[in-house]
Amino acid sequence: MTQDATKCPFHAAAASGGIINKDWWPNQLRLDLLNQHSSKSDPLGAGFDYAEEFKKLDYEGLKRDLRALMTDSQDWWPADFGHYGPQFVRMTWHAAGTYRTGDGRGGAGRGQQRFAPLNSWPDNVNIDKSRRLLWPIKQKYGQKISWADLLVLTGNVALETMGFRTFGFAGGREDTWEPDQDVYWGSEKTWLGGDARYGKGTPGDGTLVAEPAMHGHEKDRVLENPLAAVQMGLIYVNPEGPEGNPDPVAAAHDIRETFARMAMNDEETVALIAGGHTFGKTHGAGTADHVGPEPEAAGLEQQGLGWASSFGSGKAGDAITSGLEVTWTSTPAQWGNEFFENLFKFEWELTKSPAGAHQWQAKNAPATIPDAHDPSKKRVPTMLTTDLSLRFDPAYEKISRRFLENPQAFAEAFARAWFKLTHRDMGPRARYLGPEVPKEELVWQDPIPAVTHDLVDAADVAALKARVLASGLTVQELVGTAWASASTFRGSDKRGGANGARIRLAPQKDWAVNQPEQLARVLQVLEGIQREFNKGADGDKRISLADLIVLAGAAGVEQAARAAGVAVTVPFHPGRADARQDQTDVESFSVLEPSADGFRNYTKARYSVPAEVLLLDKAQLLTLTAPEMTVLVGGLRAININVGGATHGVFTATPGALTNDFFANLLDMSTEWKPAGDLFEGRDRKTGEKRWTGTRVDLVFGSNSVLRSLAEVYASADAKEKFVRDFVAAWAKVMDLDRFDLR
């Protein structure tokens, strides 16, 4: 028997696709999201320390090479106006601009622009050429500079070579080696579709086109959370206007909403748009049907590049990116104030690019704008619909006129907004590396005072634990408060966490999930212990409330373990400080309020997304693995830190003891589970007597095959000590997630 050589062997079929579980069961829980970016995908190995490598970088040499690159035009992709600066600014902007505050995901922090889907988004057409221009420099400096850092630093150097003074630069972004799978970019299945995120709109066909049916309805739409772009594959907004409708006032609504979701106020928004559009041009020499597949769909011979164009030479003056053909100023490779000068000097008439896209042309204006590649040609000034929003939206106009009259204020605002744009997802200043880190502390960096006192030692820790346990606070209160403090951390943008003790400040002290009345009472007791200890401590030794909250949680966990018959010491690393209210932007921190916390069996409202999916999202933001998530849920149910003291999921007769009862009783086949409204009831199969109530978050550990396999480990008769020790390890990890000083 011989195999037909023309048919695909099964190994090759597996490698090239085939039907997978997700195809059969689309709603299957994506536990694989907790296994992203593991050591198996990292070619540098577990011992690689990027911060140490960065210290070895010839930083000034790198910047010299980047400056030289700016005017070293290559025949395979010639520089517009003889300067690559504008296209590198676009590259950097689009790397950082995917960040959104809702869940902290996106942004430049992990070099994700190299991978799908970002490397093939319609809004990123031809940015692949910018990264390829950088390859010789990246190759030269190797692992001393990550792609993630290089993509941002290059934009800074580009601005500097065009006469702009930047606010600074911080390194510290570590590369990942595969696409992020946890970022929800929207549910549309066509490029530039916006129908799902607004509930109406055009499905999109891969080009930026007007949609007459939408005219007059643009202001009515509300963008789906946590998205911060109006269409699938855009960074922010459609430059032609909402759904392609060239209405600058309607476009201002989209601009304000999307930029706000990236933590930008109106002044920062105006500065960023005008500053970015001081440089370079857009490209729309021909129609989109000349443009080939994006990088992820291009042939092997393209070697990771995409959008090969059949229009003329396909490059330089024949380039096609957005389909728009706009140059804003007469000095497109030089910083200046001409964007605002032109914006207000001229009246504007609607026209179309050679590709048929809506854009605006100055009326009766002289041809003062240079051609990007032909010195003998001049053009009249042009603008995008979204540029005109800065003049015709009343709030934006006020800011724009101030910048027109005060160029220095504009330059300062752009420098600060650009730094915020490119560093917003890096977390606290403790992560910043390099010689150009600004000295000024900015409130959006969530600053925390430096620790200037001596830290507690082992004897102090033991004494403080004893005081905490003798204070009258329950194990549930101690563990619950520590969890509430630490579990705000987001691995996406490195915000939140226990350091700073912001749980005692607005807005966190008032969040319903934190049970404000109970929290205030617990904090009052802990503050009393802190004052008493600090007053009697030797020398300059002190303990911060941030440290004491975590230490009290450790004491609670140890007490719960003792109640289960296991002696354990929870790791504790002092060194946290207490932030002040003036260091805490209430609006900025409000996005950290959990809509759900499955670890506390809490949901703020009824959501269309199942509670177990929200648990998974929370676990992913906490950088937990599936086993860590599993053991934490089981342990926290056994202790019972449920919001409001609810007993859902508390499958034990001894709440407060760190037992494996949650798993043992969930998997007990003598219990039959049935839905009961939004909950589930577990009843004795023989008598019908109600034993337990549980939520979707609880029951998923017996329902999902992967989670059940983990639950079985902890439900086993020999798992008593393993369960406790695994819980303690996962607990300690969460408590220290924001301790970048320990890494």
Curated annotation (Swiss-Prot):
Residues under site feature: Transition state stabilizer: 90
User: What the protein does?
Assistant: Bifunctional enzyme with both catalase and broad-spectrum peroxidase activity.
Post-translationally, this protein is described as follows, namely: Formation of the three residue Trp-Tyr-Met cross-link is important for the catalase, but not the peroxidase activity of the enzyme.
Classification via HAMAP family: Catal_peroxid
Q: How does it assemble?
A: Homodimer or homotetramer.
Record-given protein name: Catalase-peroxidase
Cofactors: heme b
Keywords of the record, alphabetical order, are: Heme, Hydrogen peroxide, Iron, Metal-binding, Oxidoreductase, Peroxidase
Q: What class of enzyme is it?
A: oxidoreductase
| Cofactor binding note | Binds 1 heme b (iron(II)-protoporphyrin IX) group per dimer.
Q: Which GO terms describe its molecular function?
A: catalase activity; heme binding; metal ion binding
User: Cross-link of type Tryptophyl-tyrosyl-methioninium (Trp-Tyr) (with M-262): positions?
Assistant: 93-236
Q: Indicate the cross-link positions, Tryptophyl-tyrosyl-methioninium (Tyr-Met) (with W-93).
A: 236-262
SUPFAM superfamilies reported in the protein's UniProt record: Heme-dependent peroxidases
- Reported EC number(s) for this entry are 1.11.1.21
InterPro entries in the record:
Catalase_peroxidase (IPR000763), Haem_peroxidase (IPR002016), Haem_peroxidase_sf (IPR010255), Peroxidases_AS (IPR019794), Peroxidases_heam-ligand_BS (IPR019793)
Q: Name one GO cellular component term.
A: cytosol
Give one GO biological process term: hydrogen peroxide catabolic process
Instruction: Please tell me where heme b binds in this chain.
Output: 277
Q: Which reaction does it catalyse?
A: H2O2 + AH2 = A + 2 H2O; 2 H2O2 = O2 + 2 H2O
- Tell me which residues this entry annotates as catalytic: 94 (proton acceptor)
**What's the family?**
Belongs to the peroxidase family. Peroxidase/catalase subfamily.
